[in-house]
Amino acid sequence: MKALVIIDVQNDFMPTGSLPVKEGDQIIPFINAEMQKGYDLVVATQDWHPATHKSFASQHKSKKPFDVVQLNGIEQILWPDHCVQGTFGAQLHKDLDIRPISAIFRKGMNPEIDSYSAFFDNNKLNNTGLHGFLQDKSITELVFCGLAGDFCVAYSANDAKALGYKVSLFDKGIRSIN
């Protein structure tokens, strides 16, 4: 059984958002078309941070976006405030067809630790529930797309491999920060 996993296609990652991914909006038509290709399951994720999230540069005196700090023993890039719970920036982009999506998994809700992966927070102490959901649906193969390819998509794909899934990337549906 095969699932499409759509990572963080949210307003704040679009070209006009607070943490823009170049050409992030251009992947949406490709993802919408890909969802129609007979997957057994389609799921999505949302970055869903509290306003006081410690990955935000605004929460650290004399720090700016893209500075690097230690946060709970893990190297953390400080980001501009983005995908704050309940804001327009945290919403999935309006052009993403959400009808085929069976479930949306939110991540990054613990203000003390970031969560790039769709499966775990960055210290791997807490999970999002995605793995259990996929197991319940007998999913063994995952295809990833979304934003950003060099962070949340990559971390999610690597964790999926470590969890035993067969993993592939839908390249037309991915853009990266760097």
Predicted regions and their residues:
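Extreme N-terminal starter segment of soluble prokaryotic enzymes
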Residues: 1-4
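Active-site flanking residues adjacent to catalytic metal/cofactor-binding acidic residues
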Residues: 7, 46, 171
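Short acidic, Gly/Ser-rich segments with clustered Asp/Glu that frequently serve as metal-coordination loops
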Residues: 10-16
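Short, glycine/acidic-enriched loop or turn micro-motifs at the edges of active sites
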Residues: 11, 50, 110, 149, ...
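Short glycine-enriched, charge-decorated loop/helix-capping segments at active-site entrances
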Residues: 17-24, 118-122
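Active-site alpha/beta core segments
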Residues: 29-141
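Histidine-anchored nucleotide/phosphate-binding helix
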Residues: 34, 151-162
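A short glycine-rich beta-strand->turn/loop micro-motif centered on a GG-aromatic cluster
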Residues: 143-146, 166-178
